[in-house]
Amino acid sequence: MMPVLTLITRLGVGVLCLGLFGACASYSIGGSNPHVAQAITHAQEAGDHGGMGHADALVTHAEVALQHAQAAKKDMQNPHLDAGIAELGEAITHGKAGHTDVATDHAKAALMHLQEIK
């Protein structure tokens, strides 16, 4: 009876460990910082609106993305976050100047950098 109980205990511990590992892995893959997730969402919106020629909407979403990216920077250091912040700043500057195509390129570059944050 004892070997069966030991086997069941070991299986239970193994399943528990796998479950914890899976939870941790999905947490890091999904992005551990909610501000990064919001920055990605708004950078995507900025790029989408820029592609439609909507400079004002691009600027609005890029500004929100920038606020979230700067908030994330308080919690983490990442070169992609720094690059994303710089690109969002450029997107805002060019969008306000009416350079929608250039602003869109910067918003898309920001999005690519933000998506690289693990």
Residue ranges of model-derived segments:
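Bacterial Sec-dependent N-terminal signal peptides
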Residues: 2-11
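Long, charged/polar, soluble alpha-helical segments
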Residues: 5-6, 22-118
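Bacterial N-terminal signal peptides
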Residues: 10-23
